[in-house]
Every structure is written in structure tokens, then in C-alpha cells.
Design a protein with these regions (language model features):
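Zn2+-dependent peptidoglycan hydrolase active-site motif and core
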Residues: 5-48, 76-82
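A structural signal for short beta-strand/turn segments enriched in small hydrophobics and glycine
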Residues: 8-10, 51-66
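Short, charged beta-turn/beta-strand-edge "cap" motif at the junction between a beta-strand
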Residues: 16-17, 63-64, 69-71
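Conserved protein kinase catalytic core
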Residues: 18, 49, 71, 92
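Short glycine-rich beta-strand segments
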Residues: 29-31, 65, 88-90
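Short helix/strand-bridging catalytic loops that position acidic/His residues to coordinate divalent metals
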Residues: 38-48, 68-74, 104-110
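Acidic, glycine-rich catalytic/binding loops that coordinate metals and/or anionic ligands
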Residues: 52, 75-172
């Protein structure tokens, strides 16, 4: 079984595995340290009965069954069945409009929840830091964890209307 890593709301369900490299997948929205964080659970064999977008799930509640679904021709072998898990930030709340403008004629079957619109955070590093903090009886801060990541590039923003900064003021 696959369970929710943290309490949150089901944001998206793809139950048509042929439409994504992720196969069947679920995206959950969590509010952690006062900003939205998403978890993605992919290659699911099946989504638990009754799971719906907008539904609130508690930490540890079963949401699916691990599997090997994908849209690739060769598929995922039984021996390689696994859960593809991501912790993400949403890149652009207007992604669908951007996609239509910049990739005209191409399909976007998942709208806002297209994998290209999710910025991944390494879950292994995050869980390790969280464990270290707990061992030292310290509070873990997701915001601090993200702020401590190496800077890969700097972006000059020419508008005060930059949505990323509005959604994540503590990260800018």
C-alpha cells in the first residue's frame, strides 16, 4: 500500500496510465511552514476506491497500491515495480496558458499537474535532515531546508507581479 506522507488534500488524480510517463499518479497538496508543498505518487497499480480530488487525507492514510504503470512502450517489468515519489513546489499557477502559448498544438493532458510544472525537492535529503533534527530534538523547518540548498542560478525579475515571490516570499 501507498500512504500519504503528510496530511493534505488530494489535488489531482491521473487514472489513465497511457497519458503519462508517471502512469497512474496522485498529487497531494500540503501546507507546511505556511506555504504550499506537493507530493506526487506515481506508477500506481491502482488508486484506492473512493479517493477524489478535494478529499482531505491524514498522514499515513492509504491512498493507492504500488505498481508499474507507465505510458512507455517497453513498460516497467514486474521486478522493477516501484513507487515514484516526489516532493514538489508548483512552478506556475498559469501553466496551462503558458503551455498553450509556448507549445502550440501539443497536448497537455494534465493541465496544472503536468510534471513539467512541478519543481522537485530531493526527498532523501529532506527526510535525512528531518531525522537529524528529530534526533537532536530540534524543530525541522522545510523553509530553512529549501533556503539552504545550493544556488544553481540567479534570476533578475523585472516585475513586482512575479507570482512565485507572492506564493513563496520566504524563499525569495
Amino acid at each position: 500500500p501507498v500512504s500519504a506522507t503528510a496530511g493534505g488534500t488530494i489535488a489531482y488524480i491521473n487514472a489513465r496510465p497511457g497519458l503519462s510517463n508517471y502512469g497512474n499518479y496522485i498529487v497531494m497538496r500540503h501546507n507546511i511552514n505556511s506555504f504550499p508543498v506537493y507530493t506526487l505518487y506515481a506508477h500506481l497499480r491502482k488508486i484506492s476506491p473512493g479517493i477524489k480530488v478535494g478529499q482531505v487525507k491524514k498522514t499515513g492514510e492509504i491512498i493507492a497500491t504500488m505498481g508499474r504503470t507507465s505510458n512507455t512502450r517497453q513498460g516497467i517489468s514486474r521486478e522493477r515495480a516501484h513507487l515514484h515519489f516526489e516532493i514538489c513546489l508548483l512552478a506556475n499557477p498559469r501553466f496551462s496558458d503558458w503551455y498553450k502559448t509556448n507549445l502550440p498544438g501539443q497536448r497537455n493532458d494534465h493541465g496544472l499537474w503536468n510534471g513539467q510544472n512541478l519543481i522537485g525537492i530531493d526527498p532523501w535529503k529532506l527526510f535525512r535532515k528531518q531525522h537529524e533534527a528529530r534526533t537532536r530534538q530540534q524543530e525541522f523547518s522545510l523553509r530553512r531546508f529549501i533556503q539552504d540548498q545550493p544556488v544553481l542560478c540567479r534570476v533578475l525579475v523585472h516585475s513586482a507581479e512575479f507570482q512565485w515571490a507572492k506564493r513563496h516570499p520566504g524563499l525569495v
